[in-house]
Amino acid sequence: RWLPGAMDLSVPGAFAMTEIGHGSDVASIATTATYDEATQEFVIHTPFKGAWKDYLGNAALHGRAATVFAQLITRGVNHGVHCFYVPIRDEEGAFLPGVGGEDDGLKGGLNGIDNGRLHFTQVRIPRTNLLNRYGDVAEDGTYSSPIASPGRRFFTMLGTLVQGRVSLSLAATTASFLGLHGALAYAEQRRQFKASDPQREEVLPVSYTHL
């Protein structure tokens, strides 16, 4: 039900996993999603500043919803990290009640992406906003999952990120290769500076053995 808005860009989104205090160690993120049986809602909460979600694309200005990774808690039991769909701004761009954030400011590159931070203070979302492919919570708070092992469940959930990180490394390697290829092609054609013999052609940059 949320895919159409994401696909047609009518609802710009943010991927809210990384926290100020936890980047690669996703299993230890501190944001919580506590289930309230009385209202059948999850309460998304950031307990301290180290748990603020950080360096999120679209978070600083334009994001209207976020997929928030948090520790899922039901009946006092922590079932580990799960993902939740959380609206963060209204149509005018103002933060919704309980949601706050700030811009990450200028970066070393890619400043066209409005990276920012988000934090949540007792933000309530419907039970059905849990992205429940790998774990679900019934109306009475009963937790269930098709993957019994918490460790296997966690790594299965994050499996898609592995492909993304490999793709990023491949893209960087490809860009480096293309840059080197262009530089060598130029160095084999460009000529400048005459040798001591005026009858000789100007020198190719690739002919130099030392800079």
Walk through the language-model features, giving the residues of each.
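Flexible, small-/acidic-enriched active-site or ligand-binding loops
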Residues: 96-122
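A short core secondary-structure module
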Residues: 37, 41-101
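Secondary-structure transition/capping motifs at alpha-helix termini
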Residues: 9, 35-41, 73-79, 91-94, ...
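A glycine-rich, basic-preceded beta-loop-alpha segment at the flavin cofactor/substrate interface
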Residues: 56-58, 119-164, 184-206
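Conserved small/polar residues in nucleotide/adenosyl-binding loops
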Residues: 209-210
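Mobile "lid/hinge" segments at catalytic clefts and subdomain interfaces of large enzymes
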Residues: 172-175
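Core alpha/beta catalytic barrel or barrel-like domain that forms the active/cofactor pocket
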Residues: 10-19, 83, 189-202
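Long, structured ligand/cofactor-binding scaffold of large enzymes
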Residues: 1-35, 41, 48, 53, ...
